[in-house]
UniProtKB/Swiss-Prot annotation:
Residues 128-156 are annotated as: Disordered. One of its GO terms (cellular component) is cytosolic large ribosomal subunit. It comes from Prosthecochloris aestuarii (strain DSM 271 / SK 413). This is Large ribosomal subunit protein uL3. GO terms for molecular function: rRNA binding; structural constituent of ribosome. The keyword Flavoprotein does not apply. Keywords: Ribonucleoprotein, Ribosomal protein, RNA-binding, rRNA-binding.
């Protein structure tokens, strides 16, 4: 088992032994450092808190500066917790974590925040077909249609699919394959797409089933 934080660099393609183009996402998975070790005695559960990147102290709040100083590391851009059961190695406070714990062919789950699309209508947000394009229709082309009865039930049911803000959701994509590891640059090349925009941060965890 292994877990790490990474920064999404972008997408590319590689060619396999069958000369097929495979779309891949490149993730910069270091430098990561252990910013806190949580124990069952002190915190009620066991986990490692990882920090990624190096940030100017002036950009970090005073409480977080003290938090990083306790670990003896420079402030990072993002922190995330991973249960100790997700790590094969025993990590110490302030130690570094790299892509060496992964191997090519591993299946991983990747969690990130999807791209924000802003306020979107039902056709874009929920794939509605829209209204009729003929028979005198003038302004119902991308409208949602009826959202409830009149006297019965006299209300709109909870969960009705409507227009609203689209994207910017926490999403986990399961079962992606690591096709290449470049340890000298701490890069993971993962088959397929992962959530988020370029330069956003993602959590990568090996599959446990």
């Amino acid at each position: 088992m292994a877990a790490i934080l990474g920064k999404k660099i972008g997408m590319t393609r590689i060619y396999n032994e069958k000369r097929e183009a495979v779309p891949c996402t490149v993730i910069q998975a270091a430098p990561c450092f252990v910013s806190q070790v949580k124990t069952s005695d002190n915190d009620g559960y066991e986990a490692y808190q990882l920090s990624i990147g190096e940030r100017k102290e002036a950009k970090v709040s005073k409480p977080m500066r003290g938090h990083y100083a306790k670990a003896g590391i420079t402030p990072g851009y993002k922190i995330a917790e991973f249960g100790k059961d997700l790590m094969d190695a025993d990590l110490e406070l302030g130690s570094s974590v790299s892509v060496d714990m992964f191997k090519e062919g591993d299946k991983v789950d990747v969690r990130g925040v999807t791209k924000g699309k802003g306020f979107a209508g039902v056709v874009k947000r929920h794939n509605f077909a829209g209204g009729s394009r003929t028979h005198g229709q003038s302004d119902r082309l991308r409208a949602p249609g009826s959202v409830g009865g009149s006297s019965d039930p006299s209300r709109t049911f909870k969960g009705m699919r409507m227009a609203g803000r689209m994207g910017s959701k926490n999403v986990k994509v399961r079962g992606l394959q690591i096709v290449k590891i470049i340890p000298e640059s701490n890069l993971l090349v993962i088959k397929g797409s992962v959530p988020g925009v370029k330069n956003s941060y993602v959590e990568i965890v090996t599959r446990n089933k």
